[in-house]
């Protein structure tokens, strides 16, 4: 995934295979216009299951500028998703009353549902995005079965939800 050079840089050893890597060719799923609208209309935080170094590369490729205090990666907390702690902490740091947390896994939605249950002072909405392993009617049903507030085809549809 990282490619040989980045693997050596980030992991500190030789990669199991010599390859260019996928990380720089991975499709960027969000349009520049969506990024602009989101940054103009909402406080943005990132909660990802990726390691910090990989998340940084992805954010740079999307040209998202998000303060470190508004980012949580797999390196930042032991529990991981769907534990609500990181999302609740982001909500505190963003001083948000309502949180829309979008992701392409069931655990993303579960994280928001769990945070909504655990934190009575805020409202959390988990939004399923059909761009990961879940797609079509089966993906829609799966997200709804774990309590999704909404299910969207693309992260670019988020702007319609938050306006």
Question: Which sequence ranges carry the predicted segments?
Answer:
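Substrate-recognition "cap/lid" segment bordering the active-site pocket of phosphatases
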Residues: 24, 45-100, 106-118
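Short, charged, surface-exposed secondary-structure boundary motifs
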Residues: 77-84, 136-140, 161-163
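Short, acidic loop-to-helix structural element flanking the phosphoryl-transfer center
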Residues: 2-46, 52, 56
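Short, acidic/turn-prone active-site loops that include or flank metal/cofactor-
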Residues: 72-79, 130-135, 157
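Short helix-terminating capping/connector loops at secondary-structure junctions
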Residues: 38-40, 65-67, 119-124
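Short acidic-hydrophobic, aromatic-tinged amphipathic segments that line or gate anion-handling sites
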Residues: 149-158
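Acidic, Mg2+-coordinating phosphoryl-transfer loop and its flanking beta/alpha structural elements
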Residues: 101-150
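Short amphipathic alpha-helical segments and helix-helix/interface helices
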Residues: 32-39, 87, 91, 140-143
């Amino acid at each position: 995934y990282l490619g040989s050079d980045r693997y050596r840089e980030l992991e500190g050893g030789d990669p199991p295979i010599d390859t260019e890597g996928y990380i720089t060719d991975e499709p960027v799923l969000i349009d520049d216009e969506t990024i602009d609208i989101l940054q103009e209309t909402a406080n943005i935080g990132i909660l990802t299951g990726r390691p910090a170094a990989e998340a940084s590369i992805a954010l740079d490729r999307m040209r998202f500028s998000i303060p470190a205090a508004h980012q949580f990666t797999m390196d930042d907390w032991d529990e991981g998703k769907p534990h609500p702690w990181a999302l609740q902490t982001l909500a505190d740091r963003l001083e948000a009353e309502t949180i829309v947390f979008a992701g392409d896994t069931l655990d993303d939605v579960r994280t928001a549902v769990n945070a909504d249950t655990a934190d009575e002072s805020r409202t959390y909405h988990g939004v399923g995005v059909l761009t990961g392993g879940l797609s079509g009617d089966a993906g829609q049903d799966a997200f709804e079965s774990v309590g999704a507030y909404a299910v969207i085809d693309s992260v670019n549809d988020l702007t319609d939800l938050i306006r």
